[in-house]
Amino acid sequence: MSAFDENTVELAALEYFAELGYCTGYAPVDAAVGSVRDSPSDVTLWDRVTSALSRLNPDASPMMVGEALKRIQRAESQDTVLENQRLHDLMVNGVPVETKAADGQPATVLLRLVDFDRPRNNDWLALNQFTIVENGHNRRPDVLVFLNGLPVGLLELKNPANEHATMRHAWNQIQTYRSQIPSVFVPNVVTVISDGTAAAMSSFTGGFEHYAPWKTIDGRDVITNRPALEVLLKGVFAPERFLDIVRNFVVFSDEPVMDEASGQRRRALIKRVAKYHQYWAVNAAVESTIRASGPDGDRRGGVVWHTQGSGKSFEMVFYAAKLMRDPRMANPTLVFITDRNDLDDQLFGEVFAPARILPETPIQAEGRDELRSLLTRASGGIIFTTIHKFAPGEDGDTNPVLTDRRNVVVVADEAHRSQYGFSETLDSQGRLKAGLAKHMRDALPNATFLGFTGTPIESNDRSTRASSVITLTSMTSRARLKTVRQSRFTTSHALPRSSWLTIPWPLLMT
């Protein structure tokens, strides 16, 4: 056997986990059948699950903990993706358990399965060579990662000394596991493949082309002088970051897919996990929005600039989900703006409506009257509309101030096409006329504005306003990823690229 083989990569991975504060071990000893596991078919370490439920819910009786265990173990579907969604919901939202209130009436309480507020209060474990026997198949994933006893990560590693042991072979092995030992994926959050040189991650439903590297640990610098596997593991599995991914960067979506057997399109539940550029951009955009919407904020959330193929639509979903949950925003209202009905239908119907991550159901405004009604609500709401619904009526009726709340956030898709025209000009009949963006701002005077665009905002024919630009590329391009702050984007012409100032956020090379 080569001195540098698959076992070497496994041990290196365990060392990286140990540096993150995980307990590590050798599964034949530390997850032995007969002592730790009742059966080789057990993929969950139930003693650790029980211990976590008791520790994280000190007021829960042993009976309640037992009921929670039964709820976790009780399958509701034979479909692995549906079961994965069920376990994900239990991890994020808690395990519902029936009990009695102080007055003797039936009540439902949620027992925490994960402590999201104190990451180190959870039980973190990584084991290699974990043998699983299921449906007559005996398989041994290279490394399993456990959170409070649940196998949330799976690593498939190949021998870097073997030129035939490629990333594709590692992905193929995961497909074998999906068909032969599907139970290991029921609680799974992330799968990782590596050939010892390259490393990539995705959800277990991801095709090979959807596995992507994670190129930064802290979101500031791309690391090229350390192993890709180390960067990925320390970037994704650091406890605080991993829990952020679990709660805010995993989306299940009912989408049309091609059935390989029949050749027909059908709808299926797809699981997506954010790629590294989506993760860091969303967190930067959320913090920028919170700053801009605060008492001393300037209401300019910034512009997220993408190139094609970088996952803008789902990034907007992640942004909405995380911002809506942030207590600093006090249950905000989000208004998503497009400049065409077909784009409004597409973003709402194909991306947001099927996405099972949002804390409330998005609504598409059908007309000006409904939009006005939706925007007068006291709090909350994810509203979709075209900018034209802010236009004056045929009788000259303009929008009144619909709400003066500061926790209203307007998100403009392809912002370069709609966020201009802030000044009044004389029309051909000598009447003052303002652009749609001004009418929208008049109706929402204290709203914060965030833009998404795939077009560089530096042309001279638009007055797009923003205070910061977060630029993103596709994962395959060789362009730089960076966040820049513009001095002020308030003149009649967009500022040229030379005026951008770099601020602390990723300066990344893809």
What are these regions (language model features)?
Residues 353-395:
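Inter-Walker segment of RecA-like/P-loop motor cores
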Residues 307-308, 416, 437-460:
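Conserved helicase ATPase motor motifs in RecA-like P-loop NTPase domains
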Residues 223-228, 461-510:
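Interdomain helical connector at the RecA1-RecA2 junction of SF1/SF2 helicase-like NTPases
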Residues 336:
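Conserved SAM-binding loop
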Residues 296, 408-409, 415-418, 428, ...:
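Conserved N-terminal glycine/acidic-rich loop preference
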